[in-house]
Design a protein with these regions (language model features):
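Active-site-adjacent core segments of small-molecule enzymes
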Residues: 1-230
């Protein structure tokens, strides 16, 4: 057994016991749209499209207690591949080194989310970050997000940075309609598997470990091993 398989086994065991994801077990699934604001050809090849998004809490602590928060979205199948493109983010700090570190928060607003790992594209390393632009009440309950989407929409500002350079606007992500889901009917986002040609997470050893963890988690909770936009 490979070391990556061995290290990923706890994810399967935890998912089997909980019958749900070990991390980010509960979230709000919604449809929406991403609109590119960066000039064409500048930075990562994210284009305007419909998306499937999920806002979640990493530990799943109920109510307004501090937790890590997550944002995931799926872009449609690319013309050159049969799989869509998944992007996953979690709450982090704001500095260069803080991009690598998880940071709990007490509020949906004034919180930075990062991909935690850079994306390799055109021989360069690119980072993504997101910040919620919608004004939200104090607190960290998922009901706040769900109610805001149902009543109106939630908007995230998506930015990109090359290497240690400054972040620049890339796109606006809007989630506008919640999708009913439960423990048996949810979407398994996987940025290590669902990507497009020329874009990959790095470093490779960490991507391999993360890929095994996602696979074991799906196996543990009997989640479908497939990807679709809806």
């Amino acid at each position: 057994m490979k070391a990556s398989d061995l290290l990923a086994w706890p994810m399967k065991l935890g998912a089997e016991v909980r019958r749900r994801r070990v991390f980010h077990p509960v979230g709000v699934l919604a449809s929406g749209r991403i609109v590119r604001t960066a000039p064409a050809g500048h930075g990562l090849p994210i284009e305007s499209s419909e998306v499937l998004g999920r806002v979640s809490k990493a530990i799943g602590i109920p109510g307004d207690l501090p937790d890590l928060i997550g944002l995931a979205w799926r872009m449609p199948t690319h013309a050159l591949t049969a799989t869509p493109w998944d992007v996953l983010m979690a709450s982090t700090g704001t500095g260069i080194l803080a991009r690598f570190g998880l940071q709990p928060t007490r509020s949906w607003t004034d919180t930075t989310l990062s991909t935690l790992m850079p994306l390799r594209y055109h021989d360069g390393w690119w980072w993504l970050k997101a910040e919620l632009q919608t004004k939200m009440p104090d607190g960290l309950s998922l009901e706040l997000i769900e109610d805001e989407i149902d009543d109106s929409e939630v908007i995230f500002d998506i930015q990109q940075a090359q290497g240690t350079g400054p972040f620049e606007p890339l796109a606006i992500l809007t989630l506008s309609a919640t999708i009913p889901t439960d423990e048996d009917h949810d979407v398994s986002f996987d940025p290590t598997r669902n990507t497009i040609p020329g874009v990959e997470l790095g470093p490779q050893w960490l991507t391999t470990l993360r890929k095994q963890a996602y696979r074991r988690s799906r196996e543990g909770r009997d989640a479908p091993d497939e990807a679709a936009l809806v």
